[in-house]
Amino acid sequence: MDFELTDEQRLLQDTVRRFVDERILPNAVENDINHHLDLDAIQGMAELGILGIVIPEEYGGAGLDFVCEALACEEIERGEAAFRTLISVHVGLNSLALLKYGSEEQKQRWLVPQASGEKLACFGLTEPAAGSDVAAMKTTARREDDSYVLNGSKNWISYANVADHALVFAKTDPSAEHKGISAFVVERGMPGFTTLDTEHKLGIWAGSTGELFFENVEVPAENMIGEEGQGFEIAMYGLDQGRFTVAAGGVGVIRACLERSVEYARERETFGQPIGKYQFVQDMISEMVLGYETSKLLVMQAAWMKDQGLRNTRETSLAKWHATESAFRAAHLAIQVHGAYGYSAEYGIERYFRNARAPIIYEGTTQIHKMMQAEHALGFRNLNGRGGDVSPLCSWAPALASVNRPKASLSSGR
């Protein structure tokens, strides 16, 4: 079993680490306090190839593997969650879905400029009454000649007000539940398509979150991705890709909290000795170490499976669930280690705490992932498909039980 990184992977890791240290972290606290989205940093990410990191070179991407993507997301979220969120939405939810389901013409039209960062994309799935229950969406797409007319709205959409276009999911057959959902690329500037900022969020202040509104928006039929009724499948595929980057970003949060806490615990003294000498502080540090190591192992297991072309819904779900919960716990502990300084916005620790809360909700809540894992273990379904792939390291694929299982829809929160 080889845990070594290749020279290419180490080079990518070092390059992104320097970028975060030089371009993101110096302004991270100020941008967060001022609710400022640093577009120059996004341009820098594009120049490094991060916005097309796993997209093949033939479509303008960097053509790197998923281990590289995980390493990049870890480093980026060590600096700022808003920029890892962009990778999740732009690359994971959108570009990889286009790569799998888009026609060659659609790939040239949208994927190529997305991979270079020339254009940014967002993912329009979540609605006010349709989060985990995707099939409950109200947005509709009615066929009229060579177009579809979209009506409805989406909320909690990352980069809604910045993206050049959105991958939007709407019901072409409202009576068919999830089988009646289709996917469309809706471009900014189309008449009737508007966006609005979402304000007063708990965290990710340095990012962009908003709403999408569709009022009789005529979308050419050629903008449909895949086939009519294939939207749910496309959304679930995109979520597998997005969840992977969320998990990898969670690893970055834990590492940031651990590094800052270790540094502080070695320097801060009380009663004549560093606070790191006290067992209660050591307990918190050790818990962060465990969270980091276990989360990274789960992420790398999923990355390996993705690079082998194996279905990894189960493994990615585990990684997302564990890493996001561990990240929030690590941020809580880091504040405790730092005491009053951890509570101060200017010190930058509480930012990780606020930002780490959202990933526990989007890309499937913790409760959704627990349900998925339990149903898999009980044999009610195989998350990687009937007779699907399993990790050779920690396989768990019981025979499917011949019982009726409850219907379950999986959430994006995007």
Task: Map each language-model feature to its residues.
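Short glycine/proline-enriched turns and hinge-like loops at secondary-structure junctions
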Residues: 64-65, 133-135, 159-163, 177-180, ...
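Glycine-rich, charged/polar anion/phosphate-binding loops
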Residues: 107, 124-127, 137, 153-156, ...
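Alpha-helical interface subdomain recognition
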Residues: 1-89, 101-106, 113, 117-118, ...
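Flexible, glycine-rich active-site loops centered on histidine and acidic residues
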Residues: 95-101, 123, 135, 175
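Flexible, small-/acidic-enriched active-site or ligand-binding loops
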Residues: 136, 189-220
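A short, Trp-centered hydrophobic/proline-enriched beta-strand micro-motif
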Residues: 117-125
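Short Gly/Pro-enriched turn/cap motifs at secondary-structure boundaries
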Residues: 87, 114, 129-132, 156-159, ...
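A short core secondary-structure module
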Residues: 147, 151-195
